[in-house]
Amino acid sequence: MSKYFTVEVKPVMTPVNAGLNAAFADGEVLFDWTSFQVPRGASKLIGVTAEIRPKGDSGSTVNTFPFELLFAKTKDLVAPSTLGALNSAPAALADIEGHVDRYIRHMPIVAGDFGVTDQLAVASADAPEGMVLEGEINSGNNV
């Protein structure tokens, strides 16, 4: 048995399905909170690999734009409030202010983290030093 626990997270990105065809601008919300489980107790995040689909143009131009992942957890089994509408600026501070105790840390994915194939961009980044994910003791079903 491996000493590592691998989690595959597939966030819901619905801009095209929702009729939002505009390109994302710097600082806009790509997707809202996406839950996933880690083993109970503290779990050190070692790294992230992200697969980014190409643009929908005729040349299948790859997307290699830096982005940041935000990590948060539930409190009393209640998830943080929404980050905001997709393809828009994040929610106003007043809307998320009561949820800052759920925030764990952010992880930047920078331009140098990307490798490119003809049809796909893949970014692999090491987690920031000391990044530990720990859910509520009474949540989840992983031991």
What are the residue ranges of the model-derived segments?
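Surface-exposed, low-hydrophobicity beta-strand/loop segments enriched in small/polar/acidic residues
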Residues: 1-143
